[in-house]
Swiss-Prot record:
Keywords: Cytoplasm, Nucleotidyltransferase, Transferase. Homotetramer. The lineage of its organism: Eukaryota, Metazoa, Chordata, Craniata, Vertebrata. InterPro entries: CMP-NeuNAc_synthase, Cytidylyl_trans, HAD-like_sf, HAD_sf, Nucleotide-diphossugar_trans. Pfam families: CTP_transf_3. This is N-acylneuraminate cytidylyltransferase B. PANTHER family: HAD SUPERFAMILY MEMBERS CMAS AND KDSC, N-ACYLNEURAMINATE CYTIDYLYLTRANSFERASE. The keyword Nucleotidyltransferase applies. Pathway: Amino-sugar metabolism; N-acetylneuraminate metabolism. It is found in: Cytoplasm. Gene3D superfamilies: HAD superfamily/HAD-like, Spore Coat Polysaccharide Biosynthesis Protein SpsA, Chain A. One of its GO terms (cellular component) is cytoplasm. GO terms for biological process: N-acetylneuraminate metabolic process.
Length: 423
């Protein structure tokens, strides 16, 4: 089984219900996080933390995806990523409120829901197949409760109080016969990615669970974020093992970049002689060159609606060392003409935009990105949101992201080519 293993851990009689059962994914995202303020919508590798699990849930076999929150900004981000929002009541929005209380409120208001897939927002390496395989334990095999676990090889010891004068006891190791890692299967621990259960189990307060199963996830997908120190580790892990959607981005052959607001900071300076002046960042130029070295063509795009004159735009493209497309309108139809000349498809195009009129192209491109200060970020869930602003290294940052996705896909292709039977 890809990515995980399922197992039964209890045998109370139960059987799958006949007919379709509404399966709802539910992510709890309260605004009052104590460890990292508003961590659920803080960007992790260019995507809001909650966006990683929403992307996986939306591409899975569940019937609906919900975010339960008490915060306006979390609600906005959740809707932007395609989720429905359950606005929780003040009674279940307190620091002392439990997840169980919040889920019970949700199912009281949603009588159509039969199976609740409680997914943790802090598990950014979750993939749709993890959700689907665990969900089948309930929908096809008659289990009532499924939790995600990870296998760890850790020896546990008893904790003593300071005033206790005795030796601590070992829980799972004989000190005189310490096994090698490869000789010990390890133990299963909850990894906190998800808890799936039938409506009846949640309504009972999890006191009547019926048949229980666990779903084992490999360690590389078992990432949890609780405090600041977890963030950089999770960022590196998600770039390699996170779920980036159904599209294949390794085939990017054309990068289209808007000039004003992306390559420049959107400001226009005027010389004493009345000439328009703009600045471009040397790091962005280096990023363009990085893509070109990987045989990715770079074209700056602009239109008659841009505040910059065509002469200035041509100088910018010359300095950046790439092509320029100057059109009557900046829309998907004009970009399609560029692609047709090169016999390319949208999934082979990466696009960087910044304004509301860029939404159409962003929604078509196989890979899209925005600077940190882009107004369009309020309108569409970008696949990558830069930490840097337009004209301040955002193009370089997005270029590095494009290349990292290409390397990631190459690793996966090489892994698939390995003959595991003769390895």
């Amino acid at each position: 089984m890809e990515g995980g293993r399922c197992a039964q851990v209890s045998s109370v009689p139960a059987s799958p219900s006949s007919g379709h059962r509404h399966r709802a994914a539910l992510i709890l995202a309260r605004g009052g996080s104590k460890g990292i303020p508003l961590k659920n919508i803080k960007n992790l590798a260019g995507v809001p933390l909650i966006g990683w699990v929403l992307r996986a849930a939306l591409d899975s076999d569940v019937d609906s995806v919900w975010v339960s929150t008490d915060h306006d900004e979390i609600e906005r981000v959740a809707k932007l990523w395609g989720a429905k929002v359950h606005r929780r009541s003040p009674e279940v929005s307190k620091d002392s409120s439990s997840s169980l209380e919040t889920i019970q409120e949700f199912i009281r208001l949603r009588p159509e829901v039969d199976v609740i897939c409680h997914i943790q927002a802090t598990s950014p390496c979750l993939h749709p197949h993890h959700i689907n395989e665990a969900l089948q334990k309930i929908t096809h095999q008659g289990f009532s409760y499924v939790l995600s676990v990870v296998r760890r090889h850790q020896f546990r010891w008893e904790e003593l109080q300071e005033n206790e004068d005795r030796n601590p006891k070992s829980f799972n190791i004989n000190v005189a016969q310490r096994p090698r890692r490869q000789d010990w299967p390890g133990e299963l621990y909850e990894n906190g990615s998800f808890y799936f259960s039938t409506r009846k189990a949640w309504e009972s307060g999890l006191t009547e669970l019926g048949r229980i199963a666990y779903y084992e996830m490999p360690p590389e997908f078992s990432v949890d974020i609780d405090v600041d120190i977890d963030w950089p580790v999770a960022e590196q892990r998600v770039l390699r093992f996170g779920y980036f959607g159904r599209e294949e981005n390794a085939a990017v052959r054309l990068f289209l970049c808007k000039v004003s607001g992306c390559l420049t900071n959107g400001q226009i300076y005027m010389s004493v002689s009345g000439e328009d002046l703009v600045t471009i960042n040397a790091r962005d130029v280096a990023g363009i060159q990085m893509l070109q070295k990987e045989n990715i063509e770079v074209i700056l795009i602009s239109s008659v609606n841009e505040p910059l004159s065509r002469g200035v735009l041509e100088k910018v493209s010359q300095r950046a060392g790439c092509g320029l497309s100057f059109t009557e309108q900046r829309n998907a139809l004009e970009m399609q003409k560029l692609m047709d000349k090169r016999k390319l498809h949208w999934d082979q195009v990466a696009f960087m935009g910044s304004e509301s009129e860029d939404v159409e192209i962003m929604s078509q491109a196989g890979l899209n990105g925005v600077p940190s200060d882009a107004p369009v970020a309020e309108l569409i869930a970008a696949k990558y949101t830069c930490q840097r602003a337009g004209g301040h290294g955002a193009v370089r940052e997005f270029a590095e992201y494009i290349l990292s996705m290409k390397r990631k896909s190459s690793r996966e292709e090489n892994h698939e080519r390995i003959d595991k039977h003769n390895f």
